[in-house]
A protein has these predicted regions:
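Short, solvent-exposed loop/turn segments at secondary-structure junctions
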Residues: 44, 73-74, 170, 264-266
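Bacterial Sec-dependent N-terminal signal peptides
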Residues: 1-25
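C-terminal soluble interaction/assembly domains
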Residues: 234, 239-249, 254-289
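Hydrophobic, often amphipathic alpha-helical segments used for membrane interaction and targeting
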Residues: 78, 98-253, 271
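Short aromatic/hydrophobic-glycine micro-motifs
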Residues: 65, 112, 159-160, 276, ...
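A charged helix-plus-loop insertion that forms the helical arch/lid used to bind
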Residues: 84-99
Length: 289
């Protein structure tokens, strides 16, 4: 009896260990013969990363429909929404004239009006660029430098129907709602850190958020899904997960579906993996190669 228990325990341990070393998950439902897949993306990795793992495109190409966070991975579309707002000069109270000039020049080159960005939006954009350039998640001259955006293009290539969980406007709304406590005053140091390092000849890869560290962890699939913990991001993660699950479950029961969303949405007690399991689906880790 002890031997049986030991073997069973070893099996469970191996299964859990293995499940932490993939971003790709297989979804089946006992009451049908459909097979779907879920991939947890890291938005700032691009085409070259995806192409290292042919299974991703293979499973996407065989799907009846593909779900993404949104279908508008377009800088111009984002800029249009932000630039349509009223001007807010409150940033000038917390940055020097020289810093404002540099930030304004930077955002102008990106087609954005500095005085129409919120603190989290500017910080988020700087962190994205920092991750791509300083953490080198995207190769030089890479055409498709966005994981999800490249998968959307692959959906078109294989004539797979695309569905977006949210609009771009909704995503910006949720981002600002989650971080509404961010101000120019309390984010000044963070904004300057990323801005200065992006423009430095000797950038510091050790940032407060450990962006480069996590990029490396993700690349090596040395992941901890923390299924026994709850997410602290109630609006941008937990609430969105619940909304997405309600939308995708009927499709999973009828079709072969491919779901591509940020890796964090697969994590935690209230992540997509656990929620699918609670709804009777079998969700199993899939080897990357």
């Amino acid at each position: 009896m002890k031997e049986k228990i030991s073997i069973f325990t070893l099996f469970i341990f191996c299964h859990l260990f293995y499940s932490q070393n993939t971003i790709l998950w297989k979804i089946t439902y006992p009451e049908n013969d459909k097979t779907s897949y879920l991939v947890g993306t890291f938005h700032q990795y691009g085409e070259s990363f995806v192409k290292k793992y042919p299974k991703i495109e293979e499973y996407l190409s065989k799907s009846d429909a593909a779900f993404f966070e949104n279908l508008t991975i377009d800088t111009l579309a984002t800029n249009k929404i932000i630039n349509s707002r009223k001007t807010d000069n409150s940033i000038t109270k917390y940055f020097t004239k020289s810093q404002i000039e540099k930030l304004e020049n930077y955002t102008n080159k990106s087609g954005l009006n500095l005085y129409k960005l919120t603190p989290i939006e500017l910080l988020f954009k700087l962190q994205q660029k920092y991750t791509r350039i300083i953490c080198t998640t995207v190769e030089k001259n890479e055409k498709n430098g966005h994981f999800d955006g490249f998968l959307i293009k692959l959906s078109d290539k294989h004539n797979v129907r695309k569905i977006g969980f949210e609009t771009l406007e909704k995503q910006l709304e949720l981002l600002n709602k989650q971080y509404e406590y961010f101000t120019w005053k309390n984010q000044r140091k963070n904004i300057l850190h990323y801005f200065e390092n992006i423009n430095s000849s000797k950038p510091n890869k050790n940032d407060k958020e450990n962006l480069c560290g996590f990029a490396e962890i993700y690349k090596n699939f040395d992941l901890d899904y923390q299924f026994d913990k709850s997410s602290t991001l109630k609006i941008s993660v937990t609430e969105r997960n619940t909304n997405w699950i309600n939308e995708v479950i009927p499709q999973l029961k009828q079709k072969n579906v491919f779901i591509a969303v940020g890796y964090m949405h697969l994590m935690y007690k209230d992540g997509l993996i656990n929620q699918l399991r609670k709804n009777g689906f079998i969700v199993e880790p899939e080897k990357m190669n």
